[in-house]
Amino acid sequence: MNNSLDYLAYPVIVSNHRQSTTFRKKLDFGHYILHKNRVQIVKPAVDTKPPMAHTHYILKLSKIQGEQKRIDKIEYENRQLCQKIANAYRGPAKVDCWNEYLSKSLNRESRNRELVRITMENQGILRRLSDRKPNYDRRSSEMDWQNSRRYIRNTTRYLLFQED
């Protein structure tokens, strides 16, 4: 591009000595600058931005809430353990290691009274049942059964049993 004679934007097969390259060079340079400006102004047609980040995708509130509940539970248990340790240090020394836990129910005595009452009632019912004698006669029930069998035999067309 140093020499205007060396420049031909559109080389021709047959060149003429009168052919002026400076005008053609100006036109081509103007088109080049125009093209360069257009390329700089152009915005991409393809969206290359990252997708919109929604907060509820990233910040899971239910997970945070569950984690907070778990932390609260751990802190509560830690406080309970600290209280037990403090009570152990404050209280008298206990050498034996088989102190069994007794349930500290508020209504244990009333439940025990109810259990004793029910047990006594059951024993009374059992005693009354065992003291009772049977009040039916075996001989009369057998006679009734034979009579009913005879009535059935007399009223049916076919025999019920061959051995009767």
UniProtKB/Swiss-Prot annotation:
Cysteine pairs bridged by disulfides in the record: none
Annotated InterPro entries: CFAP97D1/2 (IPR038792), Hmw/CFAP97 (IPR029488)
Protein keywords: Coiled coil
Keyword Transmembrane helix: no
A Gene Ontology biological process term: sperm axoneme assembly
Coiled-coil blocks: 61-88
Protein name, as recorded: Sperm axonemal maintenance protein CFAP97D1
Coiled coil among keywords: yes
The family this protein is said to belong to: Belongs to the CFAP97 family.
Transmembrane intervals: none
One protein family per Pfam: Hmw_CFAP97
Tissue-specificity statement: Expressed exclusively in testis.
Its biological purpose: Required for male fertility through its role in axonemal doublet stabilization which is essential for sperm motility and fertilization.
Phenotype upon loss of function: Male subfertility. Sperm show an impaired ability to penetrate the zona pellucida and abnormal motility characterized by frequent stalling in the anti-hook position with the flagellum and hook of the sperm head pointing in opposite directions. Sperm flagella lack outer microtubule doublet 4 in 63% of mutants while doublet 7 is missing in 14.8% of mutants.
Superkingdom: Eukaryota
